From Swiss-Prot:
Molecular function GO terms recorded: 3 iron, 4 sulfur cluster binding; 4 iron, 4 sulfur cluster binding; electron transfer activity; iron ion binding
Domain 4Fe-4S ferredoxin-type: 3-31, 36-67
Cofactor: [4Fe-4S] cluster; [3Fe-4S] cluster
Protein name per UniProt: Ferredoxin
Coiled-coil regions listed in the entry: none
Cysteine pairs bridged by disulfides in the record: 22-49
Function: Ferredoxins are iron-sulfur proteins that transfer electrons in a wide variety of metabolic reactions.
Amino acid sequence: MAWKVSVDQDTCIGDAICASLCPDVFEMNDEGKAQPKVEIIEDEELYNCAKEAMESCPVSAITIEEA
């Protein structure tokens, strides 16, 4: 199974918890906002990591959906 990860740049407040929890999937861009390092995740471990980051985002800026 594969999942698509995205971050709503208008919603993101740059808390960086996603990049801290899941650095293989998320990074901070030059504007101080989170962005996915990879658009599609196929590894279940990375999915679980990204899901934890999504659930920890204080403004719900992260979306994960089946690809």
